Amino acid sequence: MELLLLADFYIGDHQFGINILKVQEINKNPPITKVPQSQEFIVGVMNLRGRIVTVIDLAAKLRLEFTAPGRDNRTIIINSQDEYIGLRVDRIGDVVPVKTANVEPPPVNIDGVLGSFAEGVLKTDTGLIGILDVEAVLA
């Protein structure tokens, strides 16, 4: 039995997970410098111990409903192909151990977040967790 550890988080009422091996750290409202004329989903850049990190508004990137910045917002710092990227999310959940056999492929006939950016879907007692494909989100 192979286990996958997910860092789960929320954007509005939507629950998502990222493979914990991709997560470097989670920051609470770091200072962010806006970048003029950047894409609408780019929040700006932050200084992470001397490293410049681009911060993405994950709600905007996934074309989900905008939620106002709040005290529960967090920035998940991920490592993708030796580059650090920050993903701003509404709130963080838990680290969820998942049997890989319980992860289903995303539906092939669906557009939107699950069709474009999910590498899998996990059914839970409370609904579905979309497991994000970090490389697809950053492409």
Sequence positions of predicted segments:
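An acidic, low-aromatic, low-complexity terminal/linker signal
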Residues: M1-A139
